[in-house]
């Protein structure tokens, strides 16, 4: 039986935070390294705040969760859902990578694939939720969609610019 991410994160975190790993990666010994979060957190948010459960609500909002937030700070997703709910919105959690690391690293073919997959997921969500605004928690992920996706996918540039995409702090 293979080891799933459910158990793997428990093994990876001590290795990520070890002095040897920091030295190999060129990280200062006193600097902290964020660990991977338990995957059960994200499953709970995805199940509790699905696009389907928000369908038909006038005040539905798509909460786009990028790969960094998903892996390192899923509790932030719960807090954001609480804030949106307190403001009278119905959050719909959509988890999909931004491709920011691939874009920054110059891996354009991979970046394009990630952008296509993420845009398709967001487009399907906005159709289901009658053009609900898209909020992101990680500014660099949102800026990737706004600035870079149009360059990577010229045919989608009009759709991207017509959407209400912002970070939660805007």
Report residues per predicted region.
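Iron-sulfur cluster-binding electron-transfer modules in prokaryotic oxidoreductases
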Residues: 1-170
């Amino acid at each position: 039986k293979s080891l799933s991410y459910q158990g793997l994160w428990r093994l990876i975190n001590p290795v990520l935070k070890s002095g040897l790993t920091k030295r190999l990666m060129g990280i200062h010994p006193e600097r902290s390294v964020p660990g991977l979060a338990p995957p059960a957190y994200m499953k709970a948010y995805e199940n509790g705040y699905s696009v389907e459960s928000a369908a038909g609500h006038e005040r539905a909002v798509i909460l786009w969760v990028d790969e960094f937030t998903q892996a390192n700070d899923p509790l932030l997703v719960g807090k954001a859902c609480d804030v949106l709910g307190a403001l009278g919105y119905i959050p719909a959690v959509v988890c999909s990578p931004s491709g920011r690391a691939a874009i920054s690293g110059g891996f354009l073919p991979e970046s394009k694939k990630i952008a296509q997959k993420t845009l398709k997921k967001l487009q399907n969500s906005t159709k289901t939720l009658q053009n609900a605004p898209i909020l992101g928690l990680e500014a660099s992920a949102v800026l990737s969609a706004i600035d870079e996706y149009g360059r990577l996918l010229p045919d989608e540039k009009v759709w991207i610019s017509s959407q209400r995409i912002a970070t939660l702090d805007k």
